[in-house]
């Protein structure tokens, strides 16, 4: 059986439930085999292309998996905090984000720029809060 579970890389849980609220820790595009979605090696020198849209989609999928462990879905998300390494990626991030969430019915959202994330191949990390009655 394939193990597709991503394990935390620090002393924290992926999710924390407090009553009807579910907090999902900062999530990246990391896959179970410890590679990252949205990272393409483009030459023999090791140059990489980091794709904000692909990473944002993968983060959303990872968040959905973590919410499912708590019996919730992306529809239960009420607040999103996104961390971008480069605000020049905002348009691509926003485009991928809007493939699922929209301004009328989506969650509240804050997007901030950060100096770096825990791995140099990461361009986005997202944490969410969801509300799902137990």
What are the functions of these language-model segments?
Residues 1-61, 65-78, 84-134:
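N-terminal presequence-like segments and the immediate start of the first folded domain
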């Amino acid at each position: 059986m394939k193990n597709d579970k991503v394990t935390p890389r620090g002393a924290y849980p992926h999710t924390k439930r407090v009553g009807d609220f579910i907090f999902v820790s900062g999530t990246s595009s990391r896959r179970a085999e410890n590679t990252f979605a949205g990272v393409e090696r483009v030459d023999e020198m090791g140059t990489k292309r980091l794709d904000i849209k692909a990473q944002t989609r993968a983060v959303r999928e990872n968040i959905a998996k973590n919410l499912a462990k708590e019996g919730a879905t992306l529809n239960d998300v009420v607040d999103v905090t996104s961390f971008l390494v480069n605000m020049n990626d905002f348009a691509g991030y926003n485009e991928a984000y809007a493939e699922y969430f929209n301004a009328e019915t989506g969650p509240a959202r804050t997007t901030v720029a950060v100096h770096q994330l825990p791995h140099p191949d990461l361009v986005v990390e997202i944490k969410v809060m969801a509300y799902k009655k137990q």
